C-alpha cells in the first residue's frame, strides 16, 4: 500500500485544488496538493515537502481531516488529508497543469481523482449542515 498525504488548504470560503499533469496517471484530474511519503519521513514532513516542491509554499500542518484507502487498478493508496494553512508564499504551478481556489458549491464543476470522492462528499455534507446552522442563527467554526 502506498502512503500518500494531501492538504486541505482554506482561504476564506474557498479551498485549493490542483490539476494533475496530462502525462501522469490520472492525468488532468483534480486533486488536493500532496504526494507520497518517502522512507524515513513523517506524514507531516512529507506534506510540507510536497507543498514546497509542487506549489513553492510553506504550510503549517494541522489536524487530520480524513483517512481514505482507495484501490486503483495500478495501486492501492492510503491517503491522509490534513488541514493545512499557507505560512509563507503564494501558490505557483510548479508541477500541476493548473491550480484553483474553489468553493464547496463548485466541486461538481471539476473531475477529481476517485480517491478524493469520499472526501468531497464529507465536505459537501459539512457545508450543508453549516449553512443550515447559519440559517438557524447558529454560527459554527
Q: PLM ranges: what are they?
A:
Residues 46-52, 64, 82, 99, ...:
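Hydrophobic packing within well-folded, soluble alpha/beta domains
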Residues 1-16, 36:
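Conserved N-terminal beta-strand and adjoining loop/helix that marks the start
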Residues 58, 68-90, 100, 123:
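Active-site-adjacent beta-strand/loop module that shapes the phosphate/pyrophosphate-binding cleft
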Residues 14-53:
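Conserved Nudix-box catalytic region and its N-terminal flanking loop in Nudix hydrolases
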Residues 54-61:
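Short secondary-structure junctions
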Residues 83, 92-123:
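NUDIX/MutT-family hydrolases
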Residues 115-141:
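Charged phosphate-binding loop/patch that engages nucleotide di/tri-phosphates or the phosphate backbone
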Amino acid at each position: 500500500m502506498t502512503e500518500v498525504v494531501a492538504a486541505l488548504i482554506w482561504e476564506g470560503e474557498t479551498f485549493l485544488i490542483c490539476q494533475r499533469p496530462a502525462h501522469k496517471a490520472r492525468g488532468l484530474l483534480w486533486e488536493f496538493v500532496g504526494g507520497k511519503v518517502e522512507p524515513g519521513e513523517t506524514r507531516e514532513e512529507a506534506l510540507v515537502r510536497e507543498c514546497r516542491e509542487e506549489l513553492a509554499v510553506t504550510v503549517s500542518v494541522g489536524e487530520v481531516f480524513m483517512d481514505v484507502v482507495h484501490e486503483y487498478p495500478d495501486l492501492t493508496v492510503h491517503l491522509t488529508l490534513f488541514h493545512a494553512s499557507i505560512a509563507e508564499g503564494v501558490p505557483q504551478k510548479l508541477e500541476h497543469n493548473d491550480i484553483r481556489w474553489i468553493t464547496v458549491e463548485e466541486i461538481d464543476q471539476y473531475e477529481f481523482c476517485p480517491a478524493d470522492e469520499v472526501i468531497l462528499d464529507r465536505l459537501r455534507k459539512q457545508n450543508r449542515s453549516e449553512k443550515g446552522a447559519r440559517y438557524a442563527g447558529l454560527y459554527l467554526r
